[in-house]
């Protein structure tokens, strides 16, 4: 199967390169009868859009999304929805210098080994620019899930470098350029990013995504488990190197009687499981964490080779993010929404109704 | 799509419950012409098989696998391969006591919410017993990949509780009951497990899986990336709560110039990426780590409710593993083999050959 | 994707060769809560089973089916259902003579070109023996659809050679060895088959399948249309060379005002469309016709070549059906049931419920 | 899975309605390294394009196709290819009169039953306008197959009404407005169509598609057989009611010794099978026939009901084809190309190379 689709009943297929004519996608499986407009999608596209502060690349992307099909008189028809976002403000010439080089940490080397050639302009298809359509598709899923059963999917920056942010206030998240929920971290984050900018370096981050009001029963064991599909979707985001559900790697040193979530007639007493038991949602909030590596394009020179095997030293400045993890918040929300939407539809299909 | 299949060109579909008549699977997509026998599969099934030491459940499972189709005169024919493993030594009566209870940490609650009922005997389909067929399927993939391009897939215990094991000696891994590569950890692990057994508790673990000689080019961006499919496959293993590729969560506090793997004419100077760049294998060893939670069935009593909402205190002794992570080593190897096999075939299909 | 699966939400995967150890399958996607027993499946297996008359091969196949999983206390659990049918009464030695020959009309040649080798015993995987599991899977779908919304799926022989049978009496269908609904054809059919048997020849047939009480709305345009999926499923039956929906090829010479089915407040005035409009069920009976070629193994000698290219004349007697179309009736019913079941679940998943 | 995709390794996904903003698609799985331009696609789009004669609807569709991604420096990159065709010349107001009516023979009724509403403008998604993208996708597959192994896929009109056309001259096909290969039929066809136009009626047709130089071995039994996938793809074309492979329905009255294709050291002596044995290509030309119903929109009045159940008489003139079968030739060629391309890649993936 082509690698550019995700989901079964709710299926998102995308195309587009960093410096191509446009990015686009087809969203298949949206039930008919839901009000939907381009504005519904633009909200999250704007949250993802860089250029709003010094913390992310100054490259200005006017990501205006167009819905080309699947809507009639303002309502979804149940047919496939075509999405289009034109590319603008491209400085392809910036990339001439790396056309024959493999930028360490980037996909240049592996793409060329796989395809025998590559679109070197801004990383081509391997650029995070591709996530624009993921965010638009996720916005459709978010809206459906909210209308249909009140599911609320939100994310925030949990850590940048050594600075850990606690979930103190959801309202704070949209009020600072870091998607940070912890007002006490803002100054430290500000200093960290300013210093990194000064020295032309970048840093990794941890993002947490939480879905509330998820009904119990979502997930199709033994392979299409909800946690497994979330891991797939989240790991498919550029720069993600790790995924956790609930306590994640902390379970390694936990004892059996510490880890299990006890149950009372009032519900669960804890949520170490992150809302998923045996690959199926339990009705508790679904919690996932992801680790994003630092951008590889920094001012520090490094060693690499050309397509012809010659060793060279390069400095890949470009106009890149100091912390790609920040922009990953709306992207990760979108991927969780896409997975939950798909499983919501699958669960409805398989529900019991025969005696 | 049914949730009991994994893979596209190399597709594994399974059935069977902990205490049903049998476990089985269908392996579709094995290329014709490879010598294959039941013995090839039995090796890994025995490695997974409990009962060989006090560290894992004394339940004796004689997991003899039968190949029912797809082989003619000792060679694969290219048609689907049917596998069967009969269930024996079942003590279903042991589970009468929990037929109306939800065991905390188990899938009892979520399965019943999803399906409206459940096979309570040993967890039914949610039992790790289901992984028997995964291991058999993985053995087929391992053999193909080894023959075809010398890929070698091996795993080991990297941590149990607070005891971290270093990869000092691959040969040591198969010589101790922990799949531990670090002889200096054996005594500590022995004491830890003995104490947990004495107090009837369990503990989590970390398992590392490494695939060597993986050719560059495996992975189908932007969604069926190699890292994303590995995350899906590994997270689908019972008790797994986290997956890392390469440096994983350590990247959060790394700087851009630390994380990227520099390249020379002799190859990469490091492997922070875990052998995957942009979702495509780079030719370096593919490295993944998983976190497994402690078994939830321990002697410490805990609170739960019945199907009817009544609160009760239970002790779910049964005959369970002290550290399920140990048995997860051959299972995780199998899942990585299944994913690499699928991507090896997919990559071959898409290779360039037109000018 | 492996070629041995069909369906998305209701997914049937099979294995097994004509003379292998066993045939089996995995049925994934059966909703939980339906009473199901091996007897429910055996009924159709017996209808398909040869040996009940001279009209079909004397080979006695005792197709006892075993359900190995997915049922608990007599009810489906929503997990995958494993099926097994053992092979018996094999006369593999009968096939030694053709191990190096390509039987014209059989798949010997194409299988060997594809796989580089073949299991020559009774055609191996290409044998109609494989349809045993399709019939068992179809029986599950039939039962679900009948319970869930009263859908009734039945087939009959519409033509053998030049003898056309009219649908005069459904009850007659199960009372003669031809699945013929037209009592006035029985004698002619009897004579035809006896003569063919005498001269060791075979004949083609046409089978009609009708599903009643199919709710309007099944089918997922523009590719997974109900008619397209039926065409796929029916054409996948051994020896089928043509598929029609409704009037089929008769539409070629129809005028626009003849073909369209007019509508009144009482419903449609005709059913030229065969119950499908724009790829979606209209609520009228779904009608399909298939053409089956005559068995290629007959007493008349014919020319062929060996694997080594040598020309030879062969007579492939074996113990084969005079009219394979007869046995195809329950198989075609099963394939229609599998498709309708899949689309019933898919339609439920996509139904509108948001404003 | 969403119903708007077809194929596994070569996957075509489409969107767009008759009177929406645009039609588009994503072609996933095109191997890298093939030269490809918009002109390569435009050729077939023009062949499909109406308005070139009185025989087809005067509606002028300027189907200029844009490739938005997947090509770099004139060559495919192996990433997904985005296609876009803008809609123009729309007379939506023409359809106001039928907004509350179900046009007999059209999908109005079934779409509304399924989705609870419909885009009534020109049939919305159910319009044959949707096939524009299929033709563009097919053109990519045709080019690849021609370059890669000389496969040549061509179609022609085999029958309109009672007028049967013989394959006398391939060159003639592109030289008349009927795609007719039989110069002796042209006058009769001309008179037939002129009369139908005069009386405002329409007629059915039969189209034959032949693929030459298809290598032996394409097809994945037992369900994803080449013939089964062709039946699926061809039956998914608007107005198609029947599909035949090789002799098709003629096999019903054939004897076993007539139907089988004998083999000599020079190859097969006949091609009753249509180039497919056991669901796998035999190396002979692959031959398929399809039956297309007459357009339902004609000047003759007919009975129908409104959405509210009121009986009315309608005349759905519009600007429609007298024989939709004519335009179906390039569409059917495209669908066969899409299926062969997918199976070519799948076969390459599964080929034997291990001992």
From Swiss-Prot, chains A, B, C, D:
Swiss-Prot/TrEMBL catalytic activity: 5-O-(1-carboxyvinyl)-3-phosphoshikimate = chorismate + phosphate
Highest taxon of source: Bacteria
Entry GO CC: cytosol
Alphabetic keyword roster: Amino-acid biosynthesis, Aromatic amino acid biosynthesis, FAD, Flavoprotein, FMN, Lyase, NADP
Single GO term (MF): FMN binding
EC number in record: 4.2.3.5
GO biological process: amino acid biosynthetic process; aromatic amino acid family biosynthetic process; chorismate biosynthetic process
Cross-referenced InterPro entries: Chorismate_synth (IPR000453), Chorismate_synth_AroC_sf (IPR035904), Chorismate_synthase_CS (IPR020541)
Cofactor(s) demanded: FMNH2
SUPFAM superfamilies assigned: Chorismate synthase, AroC
Involved pathway(s): Metabolic intermediate biosynthesis; chorismate biosynthesis; chorismate from D-erythrose 4-phosphate and phosphoenolpyruvate: step 7/7
Residues at which FMN binds: 125-127, 238-239, 278, 293-297, 319
Cofactor note (record): Reduced FMN (FMNH(2)).
Pfam families on file: Chorismate_synt
Keyword tRNA processing tagged: no
Binding site for NADP(+): 48
PANTHER family: CHORISMATE SYNTHASE
Family under the similarity heading: Belongs to the chorismate synthase family.
Assembly and interaction partners: Homotetramer.
Described function: This reaction introduces a second double bond into the aromatic ring system.
The protein's name: Chorismate synthase
Organism (species): Baumannia cicadellinicola subsp. Homalodisca coagulata
């Amino acid at each position: 199967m082509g690698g550019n689709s995700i989901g079964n009943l709710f299926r998102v297929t995308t195309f587009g390169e960093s410096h191509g004519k446009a990015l686009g996608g087809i969203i298949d499986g949206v039930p008919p009868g839901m009000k939907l407009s381009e504005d519904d999608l633009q909200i999250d596209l704007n949250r993802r859009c860089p250029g709003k502060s010094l913390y992310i690349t100054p490259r200005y992307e006017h990501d205006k999304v167009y819905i080309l099909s699947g809507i009639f008189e303002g309502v979804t028809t149940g047919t496939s929805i075509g999405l289009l976002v034109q590319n603008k403000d491209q400085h392809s010439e910036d990339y001439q210098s790396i056309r024959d080089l493999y930028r360490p940490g980037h996909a240049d080397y592996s793409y060329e080994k796989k395809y025998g050639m590559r679109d070197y302009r801004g990383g081509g298809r391997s650029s995070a620019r591709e996530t624009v359509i993921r965010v638009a598709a996720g916005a459709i899923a978010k809206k459906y899930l909210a209308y249909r059963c009140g599911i609320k999917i939100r994310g925030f920056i949990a850590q940048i470098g050594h600075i850990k942010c606690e979930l103190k206030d959801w309202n704070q998240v949209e009020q600072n350029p870091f998607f940070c929920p912890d007002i006490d971290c803002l100054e430290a984050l500000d200093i960290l990013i300013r210093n990194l900018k000064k020295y032309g370096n970048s840093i990794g981050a941890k993002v947490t995504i939480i879905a509330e009001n998820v009904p119990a029963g979502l997930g199709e064991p033994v392979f299409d488990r909800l946690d497994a599909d979330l891991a797939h979707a989240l790991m498919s985001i550029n720069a993600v190197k790790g995924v956790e559900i609930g306590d994640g790697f902390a379970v390694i040193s936990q004892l059996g009687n510490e880890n299990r979530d006890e149950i009372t007639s009032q519900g669960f007493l804890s949520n170490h499981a992150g809302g998923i038991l045996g690959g199926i949602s339990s009705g508790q909030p679904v919690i996932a964490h992801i680790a994003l590596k630092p951008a590889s394009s920094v001012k520090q020179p490094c060693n690499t080779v050309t397509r012809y095997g010659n060793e060279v030293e390069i400095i890949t400045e470009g106009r890149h993010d100091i912390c790609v993890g920040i922009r990953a918040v709306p992207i990760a929300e979108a991927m969780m929404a896409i997975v939950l939407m798909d499983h919501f539809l699958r669960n409805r299909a398989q529900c019991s109704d025969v005696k």
